[in-house]
Amino acid sequence: MRGTLYIVAAPSGAGKSSIVNATLARDPKIALSISFTSRAPRPGERHSEHYHFVSAEEFQGMIAAGDFFEYALVHGDWKGTARQSVEPQLAAGHDVLLEIDWQGARQVRQKVPDAVSVFILPPSRQALDERMRKRGQDSEDVMAQRLAAAREEMLHFEEFDYVIINETFDTAVSEMCAIFTASRLRRQAQQQRHAGLIQALLD
């Protein structure tokens, strides 16, 4: 059976990456697709682990070649998901998770209408501001731009299937795991996964 595509998006500072990493540690059945980006690595980030870091020229070349499943300009830098990291895995029956922004999520839903999408929100604007400032990686001007962009991004939460409020980290991770479990228990998925059993029960 074909794998399920999961989309997780959030404004910067909402804790998306931490929640995704903790969830994947609990649920090894899902593979994380590593995005490409034209921005420079931040302290502690490693190529091919956090992102595939490429130049803006290389990214534009990949766009021209049709290499991307989705891509978008985010905070002045390009980010995208390569087709090769998604389509073959889904066809082979593997579940794939995309950690992307709302623009990319919109593109993906147009291509894969049955993708399961999750949006993560902070518990308050104050919490969002504090979390972003704790990173200490950006100047005040860049921080102000990111905060304004985050508020704009949150307007798109209604486009998603599920919404998680990241007030308590462990609770948010448990809720993400529950979404994955519920997705696997949908009737269509169970009919495909247990076709033989269901047929035997009904004969």
From Swiss-Prot:
It catalyses: GMP + ATP = GDP + ADP. Keywords: ATP-binding, Cytoplasm, Kinase, Nucleotide-binding, Transferase. It is an enzyme of class 2 (transferase). Transmembrane segments: none annotated. The keyword Cytoplasm applies. It comes from the Bacteria. The keyword Membrane does not apply. InterPro entries: GK/Ca_channel_bsu, Guanylate_kin-like_dom, Guanylate_kinase, P-loop_NTPase. GO terms for molecular function: ATP binding; guanylate kinase activity. ATP binds at A10, P11, S12, G13, A14, G15, K16, S17. It is found in: Cytoplasm. Its main location: cytoplasm. GO terms for cellular component: cytosol. Its EC number is 2.7.4.8. PANTHER family: GUANYLATE KINASE, GUANYLATE KINASE-RELATED. Essential for recycling GMP and indirectly, cGMP. Belongs to the guanylate kinase family. This is Guanylate kinase. The lineage of its organism: Bacteria, Pseudomonadati, Pseudomonadota, Gammaproteobacteria, Lysobacterales.
